[in-house]
């Protein structure tokens, strides 16, 4: 997969703080790789951000894209004819009860008795599903991801017009994808979402 960074991505990276450049280019490189596999005609399309910061393929609103990184973990998603969101999260070493109550709501009592490590892991899995949903919706944190009901241990669910999937059987690092249940108004041929 190792390829030179896309010239458009390098230009954007040049304006970023130095500490963010490598992370940004790694995320874009993985996204470009997935685009080459799924929508090859869009692999070199410039990427811009909408008013809320969501990445978009310039001139192609019918192909949803999403990028997430946390430390060295990177995840991307592409959806032909769909809005998509992806989130990857390294578990926190310490999770206060107040954060569990905030993000898990009525399910917090199921996680509070767990070991500190398991609390962090389970919260990370739940948070990735919540965050993937609001990324797909294009609202980010203003969409109150913590209010999305994701029961601990869940592998899939639905929130509004979005379906989410936690890749618990495929990833050791908490990673979830969300995608719209309805099509973008476009000429896209069918619905197809890929998460990596």
Regions found by a protein language model. Name each.
Residues 1-196:
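Core catalytic alpha/beta fold that binds nucleotide/phospho-ligands
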């Amino acid at each position: 997969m190792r390829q030179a960074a896309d010239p458009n991505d390098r230009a954007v990276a040049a304006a970023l703080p130095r500490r963010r450049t490598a992370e940004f280019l790694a995320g874009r490189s993985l996204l470009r790789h997935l685009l080459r596999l799924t929508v090859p005609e869009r692999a070199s399309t410039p990427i811009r951000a909408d008013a809320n910061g969501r990445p978009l393929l310039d001139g192609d609103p019918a192909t949803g894209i999403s990028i997430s990184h946390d430390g060295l973990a990177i995840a991307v998603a592409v959806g032909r004819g769909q809005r998509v969101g992806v989130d990857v999260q390294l578990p926190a070493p310490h999770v206060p009860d107040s954060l569990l109550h905030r993000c898990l709501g009525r399910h917090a009592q199921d996680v509070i008795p767990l070991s500190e490590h398991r609390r962090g892991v389970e919260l990370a899995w739940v948070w990735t599903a919540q965050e993937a949903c609001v990324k797909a919706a294009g609202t980010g944190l203003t969409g109150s991801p913590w209010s999305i009901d994701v029961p601990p241990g869940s592998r899939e669910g639905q929130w509004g017009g979005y379906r989410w999937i936690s890749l618990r059987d495929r990833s050791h690092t908490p990673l979830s994808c969300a995608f719209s249940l309805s099509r973008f108004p476009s000429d896209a041929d069918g619905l197809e979402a890929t998460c990596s």
